[in-house]
C-alpha cells in the first residue's frame, strides 16, 4: 500500500481501548492529488482513525504512514507534512484571528520570512479578510470553522485531514469551502470525513465506508454504484389490472420482488417498482411481458444513489422512493 505516490497509508491497523476493539485491521491508502470521502455512522471509528493518522493516538497494531513516514517511529517528520481539522477546531478564543494563525505558523515551524505570505494565502482561501482583527470568541460558528480550516492549510501540507469541515456553515460558505478543498486536493492528499453525502459526490474521487471499525468498501462513487447494480430497481408505469401485472412481472427470470401501487395522479395507471438482479436484458424482458398485453407508459432502470449504497453497507434498509 505504501509507495512514493501514496500520501496516507494504513496497513492492518487496529485500535483497542481496554478490552474493546474500536478499529479492526484497517487497510487503505490515499494518493497525492486525491480526495477520499470517509463515511460511516456515528461511532463507526472515523474520528479514531483520523486521530491515529494525525499521531494524536497510537495504533494498537499495524502501521500508519504519512508522506512516507512511519507515524510510530517518525512522528515529527510525518507531522510536518500534515494539516488536521478536528471536528472541534483547536482555537484560542482570546486571540485575534491573525494572532492565532501566526501562533500556529510558529508551532508548525514556518520560516519567519514566509509567515506573512502564508497568512495572506489561507486568509484569502478561507474568506477571513473581514474578521482578521476580531477575537475568536466573538466569531460565529461558521467563521470559527473557517479559522480552523485556515490553520490546517498553513504550511501547504502534503496531507489534509478534515473531520466535518463544513459543520455549521451556511449554504454559501459550504460552497466556498468545498471549492477550497477541491483546489487543494488537485495536488495534495485529502481525507474528508462528512455526513453530507452530496459533498462526497461533488468533490471526492473515492469513497471509503466504515462501520464498527471495519472498512466495508472503498471505490469511486461510480464504482460503488456499479457494484450495487446487482440489487437494482426497475420502475414502470403501466395501464392494466394490478394482480395480473404483478403476476406477469414476478414470473420473469431475474425479478426478485415487485411492488405495485396506484399512480400518484389518481389515474388507472399503475406505478410498478421491481427489485431485479444484474443480468443483462432484464428491462427488455419486463417491457416485452407488459407491452404485449397492456399499455406501457414508461420504463426506466433506477441507479442507486450514494445514500442508498451507504445505508445498505451500514445495515439500514434504504427507502426505495429515494432511488432515482
Question: What kind of region is each of these model predictions?
Answer:
Residues 178-274:
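ABC transporter nucleotide-binding domain
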Residues 127, 255-261, 295-300:
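A short linear hydrophobic-aromatic micro-motif
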Residues 11, 237, 261, 300-302:
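Solvent-exposed beta-strand sheet faces enriched in polar/charged residues
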Amino acid at each position: 500500500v505504501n509507495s512514493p505516490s501514496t500520501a496516507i497509508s494504513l496497513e492492518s491497523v487496529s485500535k483497542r481501548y481496554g478490552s474493546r476493539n474500536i478499529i479492526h485491521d484497517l487497510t487503505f491508502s490515499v494518493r497525492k492529488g486525491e480526495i477520499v470521502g470517509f463515511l460511516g455512522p456515528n461511532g463507526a471509528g472515523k474520528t479514531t482513525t483520523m486521530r491515529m493518522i494525525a499521531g494524536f493516538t497510537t495504533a494498537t497494531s499495524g502501521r500508519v504512514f504519512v508522506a512516507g513516514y512511519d507515524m510510530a517511529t517518525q512522528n515529527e517528520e510525518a507531522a510536518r507534512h500534515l494539516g488536521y481539522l478536528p471536528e472541534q477546531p483547536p482555537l484560542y478564543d482570546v486571540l485575534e484571528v491573525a494572532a492565532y494563525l501566526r501562533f500556529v505558523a510558529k508551532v508548525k515551524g514556518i520560516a519567519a520570512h514566509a509567515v506573512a505570505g502564508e497568512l495572506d494565502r489561507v486568509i484569502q482561501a478561507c474568506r477571513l479578510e473581514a474578521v482578521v482583527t476580531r477575537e475568536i470568541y466573538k466569531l460565529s460558528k461558521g467563521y470559527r470553522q473557517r479559522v480552523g480550516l485556515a490553520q490546517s492549510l498553513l504550511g501547504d501540507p502534503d496531507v489534509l485531514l478534515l473531520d466535518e469541515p463544513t459543520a455549521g456553515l451556511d449554504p454559501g460558505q459550504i460552497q466556498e469551502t468545498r471549492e477550497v478543498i477541491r483546489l487543494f486536493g488537485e495536488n495534495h492528499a485529502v481525507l474528508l470525513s462528512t455526513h453530507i453525502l452530496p459533498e462526497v459526490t461533488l468533490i471526492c474521487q473515492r469513497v471509503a465506508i466504515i462501520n464498527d471499525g471495519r472498512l466495508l468498501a472503498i471505490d469511486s462513487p461510480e464504482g460503488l454504484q456499479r457494484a450495487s447494480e446487482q440489487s437494482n430497481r426497475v420502475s414502470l408505469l403501466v395501464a392494466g389490472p394490478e394482480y395480473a401485472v404483478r403476476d406477469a412481472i414476478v414470473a420473469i427470470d431475474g425479478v426478485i420482488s415487485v411492488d405495485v401501487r396506484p399512480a400518484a395522479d389518481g389515474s388507472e395507471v399503475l406505478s410498478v417498482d421491481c427489485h431485479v438482479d444484474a443480468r443483462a436484458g432484464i428491462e427488455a424482458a419486463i417491457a416485452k411481458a407488459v407491452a404485449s398485453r397492456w399499455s406501457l407508459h414508461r420504463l426506466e432502470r433506477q441507479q442507486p444513489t450514494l445514500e442508498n449504497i451507504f445505508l445498505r453497507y451500514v445495515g439500514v434498509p434504504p427507502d426505495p422512493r429515494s432511488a432515482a
